[in-house]
Amino acid sequence: MTNSKEDADIEEKHMYNEPVTTLFHDVEASQTHHRRGSIPLKDEKSKELYPLRSFPTRVNGEDTFSMEDGIGDEDEGEVQNAEVKRELKQRHIGMIALGGTIGTGLFIGLSTPLTNAGPVGALISYLFMGSLAYSVTQSLGEMATFIPVTSSFTVFSQRFLSPAFGAANGYMYWFSWAITFALELSVVGQVIQFWTYKVPLAAWISIFWVIITIMNLFPVKYYGEFEFWVASIKVLAIIGFLIYCFCMVCGAGVTGPVGFRYWRNPGAWGPGIISKDKNEGRFLGWVSSLINAAFTFQGTELVGITAGEAANPRKSVPRAIKKVVFRILTFYIGSLLFIGLLVPYNDPKLTQSTSYVSTSPFIIAIENSGTKVLPHIFNAVILTTIISAANSNIYVGSRILFGLSKNKLAPKFLSRTTKGGVPYIAVFVTAAFGALAYMETSTGGDKVFEWLLNITGVAGFFAWLFISISHIRFMQALKYRGISRDELPFKAKLMPGLAYYAATFMTIIIIIQGFTAFAPKFNGVSFAAAYISIFLFLAVWILFQCIFRCRFIWKIGDVDIDSDRRDIEAIVWEDHEPKTFWDKFWNVVA
């Protein structure tokens, strides 16, 4: 493990019931107890496979390895209830990932890339980002099925890179979802204003803040069911929209056959941004649409977050990953293609400020085709989508905090759970950030809120970057141990090439995402808003690097690919094959 005598002494004390202090947990090794599932360590070589972070102890003269990270009850010898429940089925996992990605970024966010890059430029951007999303989910799938833990990829950053990287990645990712929750709350009222202005925006924020927080206190199986049905509504709405658009393009609307009319006039490429030179401006417009696409695709990694609460994760997670990414690509690319055919990039409605929903290219496409009732129906779909997204925000944020706490990177109380396996304190801490939504109702508060949103977007880029880097280290660790990737429950395709591909381009995107701050002249405020998240990440990393005083990156022999995995391998899962018509139907759909 470590070479110095001092580190060896620390390891020996840790292995044999000496008090051990970690960042947020003061743990005595004597507090861990032998329980079902503990693994006897018969020889010195086996001990070396388990790093210090896993709290081994001696019981009845034998070394045992506790899977509960030292959280135990001293009096009764039983582990305290500090675990989530594995109650998510495959159909839940697939729809949670779909629901987390298909949100306001699709229904409303497509207006910006369409305006700046035109229909073809935006289409190319989303295809390119789709390839990165595929690469990242393949990497995550291989790791999350081998070690299916809650808050998976933040845990992988800690185990495969270093505790400091794990903490920085985890806290930034959690902050991202907590702030996004506030965004969704602020948008709910604006969507309802499509119908009425009689109720103040602050009232809608308060109502949905309370409702969504309470929803996240129910056991995860209820969350899974809610997300399944809401995501089903979104999927059906998009499929219906694609069929509707196909009919409109072929001439069913008031405009007659549209075909590729708008690709000829005003054109397939947008006017561009910043530069007066036409070609240069169009290229910069395409780059801006690429960054917008990167923001929009964030959420495809949610399959990994659910791995710790998935029933039979070795089968359900790979199945979900194989289906989800292609469905997301189909919905995004298909929607963007038809929107580009029905809405010209210079349509003034794309940039109007009368209401938040009025800029949705979906609603504009319906209005341009002359269908009067559908805009109201689709606005209801958007409202449902936002409520679903806000629900996912708290779920993901709370599980990230739970994972940080379980891995000694956050206070111990954040890993407390209800009898139903809900980390309720982590839920309340994440939900508390919903108060920031009220900033949208105050003078000047919206500017501060915009800053916070910039931080959240780049935090998602860091998550994708570290998923790819962690997977590279994971593959190196497997090779070092002599484990063939062919033996894994799920083997990612085209690796390690795709992992390097995703890591390279995510690094480039993180660097260039604030390029508009430099042109046509440097803007200090815009620069700070775009890049403050990078400095925050570095600050958190430096803080935890100083606290842990660890290596910049683990030696390959110290990479932990064993903790939590052995418990899963000891379980015999029932594989429920679909038998009824509806079971088979949902198996295909979800």
Swiss-Prot record:
The keyword Transmembrane applies. The chain crosses the membrane at residues 93-113, 117-137, 172-192, 199-219, 235-255, 283-303, 324-344, 377-397, 420-440, 449-469, 498-518, 524-544. GO terms for cellular component: eisosome; endoplasmic reticulum; endosome membrane; membrane; mitochondrion; plasma membrane. Phosphorylated probably at multiple sites. Changing Y356N: In CAN1-339; confers citrulline transport activity in GAP1-deleted cells. One of its GO terms (molecular function) is basic amino acid transmembrane transporter activity. InterPro entries: AA-permease/SLC12A_dom (IPR004841), Amino_acid_permease_CS (IPR004840), Amino_acid_permease_fungi (IPR004762), APC_YAT (IPR050524). Changing W451C: In CAN1-328; confers citrulline transport activity in GAP1-deleted cells. It holds the Pfam family AA_permease. Its main location: membrane. The modification Phosphoserine is found at S54, S66. Changing F461S: In CAN1-307; confers citrulline transport activity in GAP1-deleted cells. It is a multi-pass membrane protein. GO terms for biological process: amino acid transmembrane transport; basic amino acid transport; L-arginine transmembrane transport; transmembrane transport. It comes from the Eukaryota. The keyword Transport applies. Keywords: Amino-acid transport, Cell membrane, Endosome, Membrane, Phosphoprotein, Transmembrane, Transmembrane helix, Transport. PROSITE patterns: AMINO_ACID_PERMEASE_1 (PS00218). Changing Y173H: In CAN1-327; confers citrulline transport activity in GAP1-deleted cells. It is found in: Cell membrane; Endosome membrane. Disruption phenotype: Resistance to canavanine. Extends replicative lifespan and leads to distinct changes in transcriptional and translational profiles, including translational activation of the GCN4 transcription factor. PANTHER family: AMINO ACID PERMEASE (PTHR43341), ARGININE PERMEASE CAN1-RELATED (PTHR43341:SF4). High-affinity permease for arginine. Belongs to the amino acid-polyamine-organocation (APC) superfamily. YAT (TC 2.A.3.10) family. This is Arginine permease CAN1. It comes from Saccharomyces cerevisiae (strain ATCC 204508 / S288c) (Baker's yeast).
